[in-house]
Amino acid sequence: MFDRWLSRKPQPLAGAPAIRRQKTYSGQSGYVYQYYYEGHRPYKCDRTSGTEYVFDVSADRKTSLAVSVLASDTALEDWEGRHGRTLYASERYAIAKMALFQAFDERPNPGAMSADVLVRAADVEAILIALGIE
């Protein structure tokens, strides 16, 4: 009963483009997804904190759902420590977007997209290697 009163409302999203552009991705799962980038905000869950990137995703052009990509500070700082530099905001966004594409490819159907996409340290390394970022 008190959970509703004690829970904090998430911060508003920042960084959304002035004009939303619908983009399309054909997943290896066989589904074609349309998505919009809605923005990002800090998140804190249990002992983990980082940045939440929110995308509005649809696979049928009729219904959509908000998909959160959670990039933990620990995963990003691990890469930064090993490479001796700080990731730019655009590189962090690229990691989130590529993690979203990976979820489109690996999850069996659009219904599975309702679960958060978690970015691990190994994901950060693999994504940045694929993008040619050192």
Ranges and model annotations:
Residues 1-134:
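Extended, alpha-helix-rich binding/interface surfaces that flank or overlap catalytic cores
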